[in-house]
């Protein structure tokens, strides 16, 4: 009998809180979903300058579109790689871990990259390296061009 009374008291308490608006601020929290606002960035890919992998002479263009989940990058370079070389694009966690994520090789001067990314905002730069064809070394060579991503990119 006491259990039924406790149940009724709790039910009445919840009902009165809801009717007075006491739980209205709590209810949306449990149903809230995180939706990132789509972010589009475009600009010039430039040669290194002043110790940065960007800021010098224009070498191409980049367009970045991210909604915090799917990230699309299209980069075009005006230059051609040297004989036996290929350009490779990277997202770089500059100022943090320094980790470089390879986005793949440019083909005919263009890099197209699309991926569902968990934390794209950890990356601060897009950088380009010139690598040997069929390079077996997974590490990035020195950057020959770059673009600083707007912060907070991908959030």
Residue spans of the language-model regions?
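N-terminal targeting/export leaders
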Residues: 2-12, 19-155
């Amino acid at each position: 009998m006491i259990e039924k009374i406790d149940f009724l008291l709790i039910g009445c308490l919840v009902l009165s809180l809801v009717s007075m608006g006491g739980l209205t601020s709590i209810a949306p929290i449990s149903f809230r979903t995180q939706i990132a606002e789509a972010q589009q960035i475009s600009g010039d890919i430039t040669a290194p300058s002043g110790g940065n992998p960007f800021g010098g002479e224009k070498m191409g263009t980049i367009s970045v579109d991210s909604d915090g989940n799917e990230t699309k990058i299209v980069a075009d370079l005006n230059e051609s790689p040297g004989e036996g070389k290929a350009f490779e694009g990277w997202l770089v966690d500059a100022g943090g871990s320094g980790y470089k994520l390879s986005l793949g090789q440019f083909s005919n001067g263009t890099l197209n990259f699309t991926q569902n990314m968990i934390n794209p905002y950890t990356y601060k730069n897009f950088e380009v390296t010139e690598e040997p064809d069929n390079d077996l070394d997974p590490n990035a060579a020195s950057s020959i061009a770059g673009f600083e991503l707007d912060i907070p990119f991908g959030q």
